[in-house]
Each structure stands twice: as C-alpha cells, then as structure tokens.
Amino acid sequence: MLILTRRVGETLMIGDEVTVTVLGVKGNQVRIGVNAPKEVSVHREEIYQRIQAEKSQQSSY
C-alpha cells in the first residue's frame, strides 16, 4: 500500500484521469473530492461491498 501525506487543497493523481483532492479535515474525518471519467465507478467501500453482495444474490437466482 502506498501511503501519502497531503494537506487541505492538495491533490494526488491516479493514472492520467483520476484526481483525489483533500477538501477538509475536521477531527478524525477527512473530506475528499474525486474527479474521474464517467466510465470509472467511484464508491465508498461500504457501498461497493453492498453492490457486490446484491450482484452475488442476483446471480444466485
């Protein structure tokens, strides 16, 4: 795992088309903004896991 340190307003690049920007830090929460092409799905981990579980349930019918 690559670990990076960024300050508010700083951005990191993932490939050529995805940017992740630190928007703010309040206590133990970090607000980030993600810019990605429409064909790239961006989800919080818990949402992604729920989507995968739903897909798995649908394929088992």
From Swiss-Prot:
Keyword match RNA-binding: yes
Region 2, important for regulation and mRNA-binding, as annotated region: 40-47
Locations listed in the record: Cytoplasm
Effect upon mutating residue 40 to A: 90% loss of in vivo repression and activation, 67-fold decreased affinity for RNA, about 75% wild-type protein levels
Impact when changing residue 19 to A: Increased repression and activation in vivo, about 75% wild-type protein levels
Gene Ontology terms: biological process: mRNA catabolic process; mRNA stabilization; negative regulation of translation; negative regulation of translational initiation; positive regulation of translational initiation; regulation of carbohydrate metabolic process
Major site of localization recorded for this protein: cytoplasm
Keywords: Activator, Cytoplasm, Repressor, RNA-binding, Translation regulation
Pfam families registered for this protein in UniProt: CsrA
SUPFAM superfamilies: CsrA-like
Miscellaneous comment text of the record: Identified as a multicopy suppressor of the slow growth phenotype of an rsgA (yjeQ) deletion mutant.
Domain notes: Two regions important for regulation and RNA-binding are found in the N-terminus (residues 2-7) and middle (residues 40-47). Both are part of the intercalated beta-strands that form the hydrophobic core of the protein; region 1 from one monomer contacts region 2 of the other. The homodimer has 2 distinct RNA-binding regions on opposite, solvent-exposed surface of the protein.
Assembly: Homodimer; the beta-strands of each monomer intercalate to form a hydrophobic core while the alpha-helices form wings that extend away from the core.
Annotated protein name in UniProt: Carbon storage regulator
Gene: csrA
